[in-house]
From Swiss-Prot:
GO biological process: organic phosphonate metabolic process
Similarity comment: family membership: Belongs to the PhnI family.
InterPro entries linked to this entry: PhnI
Purpose of the protein: Belongs to an operon involved in hypophosphite oxidation. Exact function not known.
Species per Swiss-Prot/TrEMBL record: Stutzerimonas stutzeri (Pseudomonas stutzeri)
Full protein name: Putative C-P lyase subunit protein HtxH
Originating gene: htxH
């Protein structure tokens, strides 16, 4: 059988794209297209994941990407990044203060009582993982009544605009090292390649838009024993952070909008010696766009592990910056895996030629060894 290089036909490619569109619309005569509002609101965690992994805070465009890619989060994040690359870069955003977050959820597993109190907010942490079969035939009237009942049951209370951070209390007690502010700008992973060793800001930026499953898998390896972070969540926050930008005339910071974010700070094993001062807890930090608690926790654990690896040298994969940061990006890894679907006819032909030559040599060798001298 002969293998030759061929070109893909334009008509075949167009037909493949048409088949994808046909399957998207194949619900039947009673089918109705998904609205972007329905995707953004009813599949909010899916939208959050795409916003986070796409590295662009635009929930409505994330919903469009989900619809276009038929629920494939990797492809949707890819589309969102591609869109971002077409937009002009207007300015560098100043460092934002997440302590001003308008909270919808806030918990701590380190302390029962925290300043401002714990706020469970929207979570399934305490729910049974049982199928709700009543949702299979949910009527529009019942659907709309759910939010109304919830809002009617919420008491009118005066809540503060922001809550103090738990780690600030730990710092005040000397259990965490004092916060040091650095003047240099954060590493921009959208413009500069990762050349190791990289600063911590590059690691945090890479993990902030990393694929959730990849980040979780490597962090889980540390949790299971391939590492010794042993974290406790000092505080996990979900809420809307006001984006402050300088006024174009006065230069004073003004609120230009807000972004939904998840932020996690974990405290880990204490360290220190006589030369460094008294021992203190160590801190890991994770934050990402949208509501994605697992990703923020995994990121905080890996941040702590990478800090240890950068200081003492890696003793396991989760402490190796090159291993972690070059293998958690979903768009990169998906692209490399998908490229194997493209034609490799010439390279495979070369592999077969080498194999056949080796087989011929192996077959001829016994005959040569048995020949009379």
């Amino acid at each position: 059988m002969g293998y030759v290089a061929i070109k893909g036909g334009g008509r075949a490619i167009a037909g493949a794209e048409a088949a994808v569109e046909a399957l998207r619309c194949a619900e039947g005569p009673a089918g109705t297209p998904l609205t972007l509002s329905a995707i953004e609101q009813q599949l909010r965690l899916l939208t959050s994941r795409v916003v986070s992994e796409g590295g662009l805070y635009h929930p409505r465009l994330a919903a469009l990407a989900i619809k276009q890619m038929q629920g494939d989060t990797l492809e949707a994040a890819f589309a969102l990044r591609a869109y971002r690359s077409t937009k002009p870069r207007l300015m560098d955003v100043p460092v934002q203060d997440t302590s001003r977050m308008r909270l919808i959820r806030r918990i701590s597993s380190a302390f029962k009582d925290i300043p401002g109190g714990q706020m469970l907010g929207p979570t399934t942490d305490y729910a049974l993982r049982l199928m709700r079969l009543d949702l299979a035939n949910e009527s529009p009237e019942d659907f709309r009544a759910v939010s109304r009942r919830f809002l009617d049951s919420v008491a009118d209370t005066d809540l503060p605009d922001s809550f103090p951070k738990v780690v600030d209390a730990l710092r005040d007690e000397g259990l965490l090292p004092p916060l040091t502010r650095r003047a240099h700008a954060a590493f921009d992973i959208t413009r500069d390649p990762l050349v190791f060793p990289v600063p911590r800001s590059a690691a945090l930026a890479t993990m902030a838009r990393a694929e959730t499953g990849s980040l979780l898998a490597i962090a889980y390896s540390n949790m299971r024993g391939y590492g010794d972070v042993h974290p406790t969540i000092a505080e996990l926050r979900v809420g809307y952070v006001p984006v402050m930008l300088p006024h174009p005339v006065t230069g004073e910071p003004i609120e230009a909008g807000e972004v939904l974010m998840t932020e996690c700070e974990v405290v880990a094993m204490f360290e220190g010696d006589a030369t460094d001062g008294p021992p203190t807890f160590t801190l890991g930090y994770g934050a990402c766009f949208g509501h994605n608690e697992v990703k923020a926790i995994a990121m905080a654990i890996l941040d702590r592990a990478l800090q240890k690896g950068m200081r003492d040298g890696p003793s396991n994969p989760s402490e190796d910056p090159e291993f972690v940061l070059l293998h958690v990006d979903g768009v990169d890894s998906m692209g490399f895996a998908s490229h194997y679907k493209m034609p490799h006819y010439v390279t495979f032909q070369s592999d077969m030629d080498r194999l056949r030559t080796t087989q011929d040599k192996a077959t001829a060798q016994p005959t040569q060894e048995g020949a009379p001298s």
